Amino acid sequence: MKIEIAIVLILAAAGLGYFVGNMLRKRISDTLVSKAEELASKIVDDAKREAETITKEAELKAKDEVFQAKAEAERDAKEKRKDLQALEKRLQQKEENLDKKMNLFDQRDADLTKKDQALLNREQGLVQKEERLDGLIAEQREKLESISGLSSTEAKKILMDAMESEAKLDAAKRIKVIEEEARETADKKSKEIMALAIQRYAGEYVAERSVSVVALPSDEMKGRIIGREGRNIRALEAATGIDLIIDDTPEAVILSGFNPVRREVAKIALEKLITDGRIHPGRIEEVVAKAEEEVEQTIKEAGDQAAFDLGVHGIHPEILKLIGRLKYRTSYSQNVYQHSLEVAFLCGIMASELGINVKQAKRAGLLHDLGKAVDHEVEGSHAVIGAELARKYGESPKIVHAIMAHHEDEKPNTVLAVLVQAADALSGARPGARREMMETYVKRLDDLERIATSFVGVNNSFAIQAGREIRVMVSSDEVTDERAVVLAKDIAKKIEAEMTYPGQIKVNVIRETRAIEYAR
């Protein structure tokens, strides 16, 4: 019974709870719905207000933009109106200027028409006067011919001959004046440049000879050098191609030969043999071979050193070897290697004074005597041989031409070629640079005087300054001042054609006029 009552109570409580819950849920739901409706209504109202605000702002912005666009359009229109007004004003001014110019042209055209008419009238008057003058000239010519007894052709010829003689005399005088002025200016400038070059480069070297002397520790060494029945000296001469002269000279052996390279090889080999003490044919051949290698190395180093000292780079190795061989070549007892260096330095100094390429000038000066390094088997002058070698080993045409032209084998047509000629003359022609045999020297003086006296009008001639100047005394009755200038050039050309000489020779023609009168 109690259980049933409990169940009934539980069921009643559950029903009551369900009822109360439904009532509460319904009330809460109604409250939430009303709040949601209020919130939605509020959101809608806010959205409407915001939309109205945005719409108003957009309308205001649009109105503002329209206003600004109108204002900008008005400004543009105003500026365009101003530009158009300015353009219209300029066009009006141009039109006025054109009108003025047209009026001016019309005026000038009228003036030119008047001038043309005046010139035409004047021309007609001149034609008439010319006809009258021609008639008068013909009449006067007939009178002159009848008076002088000469035809017009003969008179014209006499006049032309007189004018030609006078013109030649004036031309000769003018040429003399111009040449003197040019010579004074050129001599002064060239002397300044050459003097500066010589002062800035003062090279020193000892002239080579055709013999070398090897010192011996004692005269007993001479017998060892000769060997049994002369076998050592024969082996040494055969290996080197040099003659050994063993005479009464104390403690010395003389090496004689015209090939300086072979002579140097023989000298080095003999010195090594003397130092070593073992002297026999087998040892001689071995030492000579080593000496040849040493000389070849010396030649290569000499070529490299020359290029380094001058600051000239990019020269072919074969050319450098030939330059090194010049160390063992001489010309009139002047060492060609030192001469080439001297010419290169002088060329560079003069080139810097003249404002031309210094490196190129030094290169041409160094290579100008390249042909002298080649043995006699190659035919041709050393200038031609040197130019061919330079061309073969890739030197520029300017360098090749300078080498070819330095002894007039080709006419010099560049400043560089003339510079090399001048530097070569400076190095070779200065006193003491070169020597020649007494017989050659005397013959050269005789040839100079013979060539000078072979010309008409020459009374006497004297070779002075060791044959570097020839003074020619001419007759004042046969040779005029103008003719003396031409005579000096003719003598110089004949000397160049018939003689061989180092440097240059000055031809000095002297004409003396003496006026004698006696006071009584």
From Swiss-Prot:
Major place of residence: membrane
InterPro entries on file: HD/PDEase_dom (IPR003607), HD_domain (IPR006674), HDIG_dom (IPR006675), KH_dom (IPR004087), KH_dom_type_1 (IPR004088), KH_dom_type_1_sf (IPR036612), Ribonuclease_Y (IPR017705), RNase_Y_N (IPR022711)
A matching Pfam family: KH_1
Occurrences of domain HD (ranges): 336-429
Enzyme class name: hydrolase
GO biological process: mRNA catabolic process
Domain KH: 210-273
Record keyword Isomerase present: no
Annotated membrane topology: Single-pass membrane protein
Keyword line: Cell membrane, Endonuclease, Hydrolase, Membrane, Nuclease, RNA-binding, Transmembrane, Transmembrane helix
CDD domains the record matches: HDc, KH-I_RNaseY
GO molecular function, one term: RNA binding
Chain ranges passing through the membrane: 3-23
Keyword Cell membrane attributed: yes
E.C. number(s) listed in UniProt: 3.1.-.-
PROSITE patterns named in the record: HD, KH_TYPE_1
Localization per record: Cell membrane
Described purpose of this protein according to its UniProt entry: Endoribonuclease that initiates mRNA decay.
Family: Belongs to the RNase Y family.
HAMAP family: RNase_Y
Protein name, entry field: Ribonuclease Y
